[in-house]
């Protein structure tokens, strides 16, 4: 899922190296923040960030999707250090995050719950049931980052199941909404660090580009699940070096 991974590189980097109260030596800390990768198919980038953050050896990345690997094709909590929830079936991440945020509130915990969800994923009705509950219970310890790259497996999101105007929908469901350029680190960090806990769940609509950073991948829906091969790998790496 190369295209899906590349749209969220900055999102995950900002979270793990600037925002989240998590650490490899505190995996069971009851006060740690929790991050959920709701768009579970985009796990390749997630593994890279976890490795760089020290949750497991970088060498493990060479075993991605191998038989009996610690790094399967979708997040599995029982296999990979740092993973909080098994995901991949779209529409499951937000309902679980709402439950975790509610539990934290009831136990007077200071932890926050973060998740990244794709815009195509928002066609799943379970997200909006969860959003209603989050607003009803005033879960201002919940931060939803919407990776809005406007593409999904079969084409443009607006043609498959249009969710625009997205900000208006989130606000109608009782969320505090902000927007940023999700592939621009400065814009993204400013949006996250500017969040306020004022009785409403927070939604950041991160406007991103699917396949960002690689010219022959970005903005093309066929790269939702394609993998570069041969000369494509060399070209992609060369372009990334220039970024």
Language model features: what each stretch is:
Residues 10, 41-42, 149-150, 184, ...:
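Glycine-rich beta-alpha junction loops
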Residues 1:
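Globin-like tetrapyrrole-binding proteins
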Residues 6-136:
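Cofactor-binding active-site loop characterized by glycine-rich and histidine/acidic residues
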